[in-house]
Amino acid sequence: MATRIENKKLSKSSSAWMKEHIDDHYVQKAQKDGYRARAAYKLLEINEKTNLIKKGMTVVDLGSAPGSWSQVAGQLVGEKGILIASDILPMDTLPDVTFIQGDFREPEVFDHIMAEVGDRQVDVVLSDMAPNTAGNSAIDQPRMMYLCELAVDFALATLPEGGALIMKVFQGEGTQELRKQMQADFSKIRSIKPGASRPRSKEMFWIAIK
């Protein structure tokens, strides 16, 4: 009996989420426009406001699966640009996108990414990474901050002066401390909450110029 009650509660919660997801304007638009996820519109809006990703650039997309940011960035850099995507999860192939499956913290994966960069320089690092949330900020926030720190470390190791990091953060404990630390290495940090971010979401995107 207890199990059935628990399942009913989960079913109600799942049904509510599914209804919101189906009714979501950006979900419907993504399906119409051929993007793999509604997150595509977040990067599109960010780039409309910053114009950081341009034709011919080299961009690395961290935590790229399922690939909507890679779709957008690939379109923005064009045929003469390079888009390298990496994730520990598999990702279906995309035209003109080099996907490297693995943990970019591991030397062999990092070296593989940089080998694809070749003699070019990395112009922009993207990170839409987020942990599997538990619904408990005491657990979720430290996990998110760790991913942010990994993205910052990668950006510092690969970006030249003037290069940019576009990174998702969850507003909460640790964000101000991280921002202060980043100010020592980045000349400018800007915050943007795109229209495609759900209003109740704590997510924010930082645009940091090295």
Swiss-Prot record:
Residues that bind S-adenosyl-L-methionine: 67, 69, 87, 103, 128
Intrachain S-S bonds: none
InterPro entries reported for this sequence: RNA_methyltr_RlmE, RNA_MeTrfase_FtsJ_dom, rRNA-MeTfrase_E, SAM-dependent_MTases_sf
Active site: 168
Keyword flag Chaperone: no
GO molecular function: rRNA (uridine-2'-O-)-methyltransferase activity
Stated family: Belongs to the class I-like SAM-binding methyltransferase superfamily. RNA methyltransferase RlmE family.
Protein name from the UniProt record: Ribosomal RNA large subunit methyltransferase E
Organism: Psychrobacter arcticus (strain DSM 17307 / VKM B-2377 / 273-4)
